[in-house]
Amino acid sequence: MFVVNDLTISTLKGRVLLKDFSMTLNPDDRIALIGEEGNGKSTLLKILAGIDVSSYVTHTGSIFCDEKTAYLPQKIENEWMDETVFGYMVRENHDDEIDYEHYSHYAELYDALKAVNLDASILDDERQLRTYSGGEKVRIAMAKLLYGNPDILLLDEPTNDLDLETLIWLESFISSSSLPMIFISHDESLLENCSNGILHLEQLKRKQEARMTFARLNYSDYVRDRLHFIERNNSIAAKQKAEYFKQIEKYRQIYQKVEHQQATISRQDPHGGQLLKKKMHAVKSLGRKLDEKKENLTERFDPEEAINIFFADVDLNPGKVILDYHLDELTVGERVLARNIELQVRGRDKVCLIGKNGSGKTTLLRMMKDVIMSDDSVHAGYMPQNYDEVMDFDISPVEFLKKEGTREEISRIRTHLGSLKFTAEEMEHDIRELSEGQKCKILLLKLILDGCNVLIMDEPTRNLSPLSNPQVRKMLIEYGGCIVAVSHDRKFIENVCDKVYMLDEDGLHSMM
């Protein structure tokens, strides 16, 4: 049994991340934990796993668990990178001695590796963990969890850095697993195909109020119901507000009329004055009732993930050649990753490069970026996977985005950041203090403010929440310029891109 009662989580500065949360995990639950970056998803998962988080949050309430939980972190810690697969799988901590009893459990180790579609022979391989691809590392980490015979799985963003092939495998693994689990993911396709419950953490009212929604629905149904709720709620709020202002205006007219009558009535008409006094008393009583009514008006629901920005007036000639690229060999060090690479990109093409982890997609995109950005006839912008390549993390978002520093420019930047749900304080924080999702939004805003007509993007949606991603996709679908991107996001590939190329050792191959 796994039961959470009245769990409240707060940062050391007092910001509430979760308030009075209670739930019971059922045997067939596959609960997806969603929310914007920085809302406490990973922190909650660690607390549920019994991991100490006292260095940055406090929590109250109780968690009762009489079953064995297994926790998958976002990444295998660096201290394991020089270890073999066997050494990693049989030790709980890096400094532990290997218990030789594990050698008698080779069958269980083999079974765990086979369960995640890995060749069990890697157990005898002396290769270091660092030499495996991102997808292979995730599978190895999952195999380690399964070797421990857990009753419950807690998975923190297992989709990070996975290629499409491994994503599809992970989807199948989660869907077919007999173990109950709670998992964090930004991948909408995986959420749609795997979840049967949603735990949504939000920070509303400029992060002054925590909101938690727990629904035993799959992701698609949750999004549909949530959208319906927001539309219905905001329609009711708008009608109530309009009716309230009508009543206020009528009240003011009556108040001013009675006030005028009181000021002009003759002192020789005491009876009339008395009647007006009673009338004013009734009018003020109506005013108090309207004040009470204002307190009970339905509040407009402003979704935290709203992204109210867009590219304006970008219009490239469809026939313009943006890139005419040929590369005999794509290499990293002395290793040849691909040969005979050919790609032509024109004005409004939206191109995506896909391929297995380690195939060289990011390296190739950087090389193409250098060619495109050397062309003065286009205005290209670049969003890398690692934002520190183009961002100074030691300055504020406002400092990063400004060019001239005029009062009008800074005011405009603040307005844009506000539309992206940045608080006034966050606008002045060093960028390094912000979440990866917030950094991504700042870079998107820079591409917009710079008026770029060509976007070069490496995994542009990887740090955005699944509820923010549809709005970013809509913005990029409507974008009138050219996009050259690398992505494993199936929704992005299907909805935004009109040309998809697979990179392998023989070059680029058109997929659509």
Segments and roles (model prediction):
Residues 1-233, 317-512:
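ABC ATP-binding cassette signature C-motif
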Residues 100, 230-336:
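Flexible nucleotide-interacting loop at or near the entrance of a catalytic core
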